[in-house]
Amino acid sequence: MNLILAILLMVVCLLAGFFLGTWFSQRQTKKLLMDNPPLNEDAVRLMMGSMGRKPSEVQVQQVLRQIRAAAKQSDTNKK
């Protein structure tokens, strides 16, 4: 009986550790992407330049704020 209980306890602890580790790493990844979005100022300038526009610094910052706001809003909508 003790052997079955020990094995069951190990399996439960392994599953709990797996799910907690997955949850924690997902949370850290979301936080990292919110703090450092993959689209930076140079990428926005390049994208606007490829569309034939010469963006000012104000326009670049406005686009970045819109991207961050949209990401934050989609994150809060999922909760």
From Swiss-Prot:
Q: Where in the cell is it found?
A: Cell membrane
Cellular component terms (Gene Ontology): plasma membrane
- Which residue ranges does UniProt annotate as crossing the membrane? 4-24
Q: Does the keyword Cell membrane apply?
A: yes
Domain of life of the native organism: Bacteria
Keyword flag Transmembrane helix? yes
Q: Main site of residence?
A: membrane
InterPro entries cross-referenced by the UniProt entry? UPF0154
Specify the protein's topology with respect to the membrane: Single-pass membrane protein
Q: Which UniProt keywords apply?
A: Cell membrane, Membrane, Transmembrane, Transmembrane helix
Q: Which family does it belong to?
A: Belongs to the UPF0154 family.
- The name this protein goes by in its record: UPF0154 protein llmg_1186
